[in-house]
Amino acid sequence: MKPNVVSADALFEEFRGPLKWEWVAGLGASERRFDEVVVRLASSGADLVGYLNYIHPYRVQILGEREIAYLGSASPDDCKRRIARIVTLEPPVLVLADNQTAPDALVSMCERAQIPMFSTQESAAFVIDVLRAYLSKHFADRTTMHGVFMDILGLGVMITGESGLGKSELGLELISRGNGLVADDSVDLFRINQTTIEGKCPELLQNLLEVRGIGLLDIRAIFGETAVRRKMRLKLIVHLVRKETLERDYERLPYEPLTQDVLGVPVLKVVIQVVAGRNIAVLVEAAVRNTILQLRGIDTYQEFVERHRRAMEHDNGR
């Protein structure tokens, strides 16, 4: 689900400190919001903010040095028409950047049309980068997934599986081996662009890991600051299964890498059988190292198949 609400007032307060901007016009339109249809169709935050452009309506329009020069570089009548056309774009907010001064006609237009206009000394490029990152996250498709989300050897790994298989205990073992916890039990996932899923912990559960028989553990307090992560990009799903499930539902050596769809993005997946005596933490780290190789374009299974093919051709040639 993608949220579709952010008001001009909320946007102003969010970046009042970082962008040091002032509200210079349209003060009565604090509840002005992004168009819901545009938000729903937007593929990323880049679609919702940019330099002044008359063919891209309904987005935050940024007015830097060149844009202000364009608005004032014609005859008085043409300048009025250029400024008046901004109303037809129905921007949720206008942002005056590069320490520019708004023409009186632009301020008057914003007051009449009740379009909020903010002014900042920051560069237009910087403002666009900041707002795109914020809007991409705010309007991202999102879901919640059950499991333990970790940073293992620098890779974002989600550990999933049936209840009672020891996911949290495995997470604790991996933390003791120097890896980091992002979230336990409930993981918030966001699609921040077309190919990237980012996961973080709900605020209520931050730094906490529940282990049966012990209870809640504050990982940050026990292991230190380096044992927790604020967020990670999801690159691998490790799914724990019982022996009978593995034999029934999965191939021993799948010809193609397994993937799982998360918010429309295919994520690499490995399945590990849980039985007494197996060191699951070592297996998970090995799976992560193998995934890192795959992401670099090195596929051990395909290399084995090719090696086997060459051996057969060599034998047939004798």
UniProtKB/Swiss-Prot annotation:
Q: What does the entry list as the binding residues for ATP?
A: G161, E162, S163, G164, L165, G166, K167, S168
Instruction: State the InterPro entries in the record.
Output: HPr(Ser)_kin/Pase (IPR003755), Hpr_kin/Pase_C (IPR011104), Hpr_kin/Pase_Hpr_N (IPR011126), P-loop_NTPase (IPR027417), Ser_kin/Pase_Hpr-like_N_sf (IPR028979)
Top-level class of the enzyme under EC nomenclature = transferase
User: Where on this chain does Mg(2+) bind?
Assistant: S168, E210
Q: Which residue stretches belong to region Important for the catalytic mechanism of both phosphorylation and dephosphorylation? A: 209-218
| Catalytic residues (positions) | H146, K167, D185, R252
- Provide the alphabetized UniProt keywords: ATP-binding, Kinase, Magnesium, Metal-binding, Multifunctional enzyme, Nucleotide-binding, Serine/threonine-protein kinase, Transferase
EC number(s) for this protein? 2.7.11.-, 2.7.4.-
Any single GO BP term: regulation of carbohydrate metabolic process
The answer to whether the entry has keyword tRNA-binding is no
* HAMAP family in UniProt: HPr_kinase (MF_01249)
Quote the function comment for this protein. Catalyzes the ATP- as well as the pyrophosphate-dependent phosphorylation of a specific serine residue in HPr, a phosphocarrier protein of the phosphoenolpyruvate-dependent sugar phosphotransferase system (PTS). HprK/P also catalyzes the pyrophosphate-producing, inorganic phosphate-dependent dephosphorylation (phosphorolysis) of seryl-phosphorylated HPr (P-Ser-HPr).
Q: How does it assemble?
A: Homohexamer.
What protein name applies here? Answer: HPr kinase/phosphorylase
From which source organism is this entry? Verminephrobacter eiseniae (strain EF01-2)
This chain is encoded by the gene named hprK
